[in-house]
Amino acid sequence: MSNMQSPPPEVLFADELAFLETWDAGTRPKGFRMTASSVVTFLMGSRGEALKRPKSAGKKASGPESLVISPKFVGSRALVERSVITLAGERGLLLVGEPGTAKSMISELLAAAISGTSALTVQGTAGTTEDQLRYGWNYALLLAKGPHPEAIVPSPVLTAMRSGRVARIEEVTRCLPEVQDALVSILSDRRLSVPELSGSDPHIEHAGLGFNVIATANLRDRGVSEMSAALKRRFNFETVPPIASAREETALVKARATRMLERAEAELKVDDAVLEAIVTVFRDLRLGRTEEGYAVEKPSTVMSTAEAVSVAASIGMSAAFLPSDRDVLGLVPGYLAGVVTKDDPKDRGRLLAYWDGVVKKRAEGKQRLWQTLHELRAQLEE
C-alpha cells in the first residue's frame, strides 16, 4: 500500500471491512459480504463509538474485538440506505449529480463493502466500445483454435456477472448511446448471450447471485450522450447533492487534504481559518449567494468540494516543499483563479467582482483574514 498513490477502499479500509463482516450476524442479501446495515455503517461511520464484536463471531474472527468505523461520506444517510437496498435487489443504481460530489467515491465504497473489490470498473468515454461492457477475444487463441470459451476476454461487467459481484461504470453518459444500450439486456435479463460460441445450443453467460451495476453520471458536463428511456428504466436514480453544511465541508476538505499530504510524507501546515476561507469562497461561488445574503454571480465552472480539496492540498504542498516566510494565505488567490477560469476565461471577471463586492465588505467588517485577501486582489489579474 505504501507505493500506491491512491489505494482503493478495500486496501485503505481493510481492517474495517474485515471487522464489519463478522460484527453483525443478521441476514445478508445474496452475494453481500456483510449485512446491509453494516454496509451503511461502513460509509457513514459509527459516530465515534467503538463497535464491539459479538461473542457469536467465534474464534475464527481475527482482528480487534472493538473498532471505531470512520465516516467516509458526508451526506444523507437515507441516500446511502436507499442505494444499498437497490443493490440488494435486481435493479442497477445510477448516481447522478454535479461534478465533484463524491459519486465515484460512493460507488467505490459500496462495491468494496458488498463485493470486496471496487476494481471491476469501466471508465466511460466517447471511445468506449461495446466490447468493454460485454467481452472481447484473445485473437491468438481465436486464430489457433477458433471461437471457444477460453478465447473470451471478459469485460469487468462479465467478470462481475460470473462471480456475483458489483461492477462499476463511471460516467456512463460519456459512452455513445449504442454502447450504453449494451447494458439493457444485461440489466433486464441478467444474462449475456455469446452468439460466436452458439452451436446447436445457445451459449449464455448467467449472472451469479449478488451481481449488480453501479453507474455514475454528471448533470453539468460537456460531451455527454442522452440515456435511452429503456436504459433509464433499468436503474434506480439517486441524486448526490453538494454538502449542505459549511462546517462539515471544511472538516472533509481538511481530512482529505491531510491524507493527500500524508501520502507525500508531508504535514498539512495550513490554519483552520485559511481552510474555512477557501471553503467559504467555494460555497459562495457555487451557490450564488453568501451566508450574509449577498448575491454572487456564479462562474461556469462547478466549484466542487473535490476542487476545494485540491486547492487546500496544493497550498499544503507548497508550504511543505517550498518553505518560506510568506503567509500561505497569499497562495489562495492564485489557486482560486486557476480553478475558476479553467472553463471560461471570462469567469475571471466574475471572480474579480466577487473580490470587489463580498471580500471587500468582509474586509470592511474588520475581519483580518478577509482584509489580507482583499489586499491580494492584484494576483487575480496576473
Where are these regions (language model features)?
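Short alpha-helical scaffolding segments that buttress acidic/His motifs in well-ordered protein cores
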Residues: 83, 278, 282, 335-336
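Conserved AAA+ ATPase small/helical "lid" subdomain
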Residues: 77, 250, 256-329
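C-terminal engagement/docking regions of AAA+ P-loop ATPases
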Residues: 320-382
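AAA+ P-loop NTPase catalytic core and its hallmark functional loops
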Residues: 2-264, 269
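A diffuse structural propensity rather than consistent per-protein peaks
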Residues: 35, 129, 153, 168, ...
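Exposed alpha-helical structural elements
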Residues: 38, 156, 248-252, 273, ...
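Amphipathic alpha-helical interaction segments
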Residues: 90, 117, 144, 190, ...
